[in-house]
Amino acid sequence: MTITGILKLARLLRLLRVLRRIEQFAAYGAAVLMLLMVSFTLIGHWLACIFYAIAYMERPHLPQPIGWLDSLADKYDMPYLANDTMSGPPIRTRYITALYFTFTSLTSIGFGNVAPNTNAEKIFSIFAMLLGCKSLV
């Protein structure tokens, strides 16, 4: 083995140290990515609950059934009845629809198939879009 071969071997050992360091940073990056995904999901859940609560609280006070809950009920052909709190689409469908809306608003995709119709829903949507822009920056 020559001296140049030994020097090249020392460089190879340095490269292995660099690779180990990169692996440590990759594990850190995966943890940060997981934390971001969990926090984004939690924020989306909270916003979906708020979006549903706005529509649910506002529904009895609207002169016409124009909220997103009423649009969803029309789409599923399951109308809300006057004195029946269990009428309308199943709660699972309402939650998934609200969650879908908040994620499309937070990520600024906004397909528009679930849309805010009342002023309160529109104000909430503006807030969700601004929050989504802030979280992406």
Describe the function of each predicted region.
Residues M1-T4, L9-A82:
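Pore-domain transmembrane helices of cation channels
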